[in-house]
């Protein structure tokens, strides 16, 4: 990459596979896979839009699990969650941040996180790899970049400041 100078990786934030707890009987990733194989092309999954990490998480899942599920793109996570809660879609890959309140309320059931390791935000939820799709990992990340040609001493200073901030207990707590 010639246009940017990397400064710091800030966070890797898992996405989560959820179903509507009242309307979808699937209680595990393996059950979703069996359901999708029994009815190819019938199960739908919502995402925050085409090309988002959430969309890609669903496509990687479908490919690795060997299932045909229909992607329903929305204009953001909010409308997708609204339809997920209303039962208009069968599955959803979403950010933990958006989905967690609905998981905690019992309206959504979390089946797996997309990263290689479990999330501190949902420690009882297995990874999708653990839950039935070996090798599955989609790890969205957030980073800071500067324009190419930024003086190295500025990049180094920003790197230090950001890395120090990311170690602060308050920052770590907010990222859970």
What do the predicted segments below correspond to?
Residues 39-43, 67, 85-94, 105-110, ...:
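Alpha-to-beta junction loops
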Residues 108, 139-141:
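Active-site lining segments that contact anionic ligands and/or coordinate catalytic metals
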Residues 1-79, 128-130, 141-174:
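Hinge/capping helix and adjacent helix->loop/strand transition within the periplasmic-binding protein
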Residues 1, 117-135:
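Small-residue (glycine/proline)-centered packing/hinge motifs flanked by hydrophobic/aromatic residues
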Residues 80-81, 99:
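Short, hydrophobic alpha-helical packing/hinge segments within bilobed ligand-binding/sensory domains
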Residues 55, 60-64, 90-125, 172:
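A ligand-binding cleft/hinge motif common to bilobed small-molecule-binding domains
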């Amino acid at each position: 990459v010639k246009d940017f100078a990397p400064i710091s990786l800030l966070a890797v934030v898992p996405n989560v596979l959820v179903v509507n707890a009242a309307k979808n009987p699937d209680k595990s990733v393996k059950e979703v896979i069996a359901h999708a194989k029994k009815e190819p092309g019938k199960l739908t999954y919502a995402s925050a839009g085409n090309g988002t990490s959430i969309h890609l998480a669903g496509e990687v899942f479908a490919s690795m699990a060997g299932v045909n599920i229909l992607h329903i793109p929305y204009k953001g996570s909010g409308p997708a969650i609204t339809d997920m809660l209303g039962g208009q879609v069968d599955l959803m890959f979403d950010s933990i941040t958006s989905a967690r309140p609905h998981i905690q309320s019992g309206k959504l059931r979390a089946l797996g996180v997309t990263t290689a390791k479990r999330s501190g935000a949902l420690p009882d939820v297995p990874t999708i790899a653990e839950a039935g799709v070996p090798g599955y990992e989609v790890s969205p990340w957030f980073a800071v970049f500067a324009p190419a040609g930024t003086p190295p001493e500025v990049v180094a200073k920003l790197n230090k400041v950001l890395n120090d901030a990311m170690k602060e207990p308050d920052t770590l707590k907010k990222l859970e």
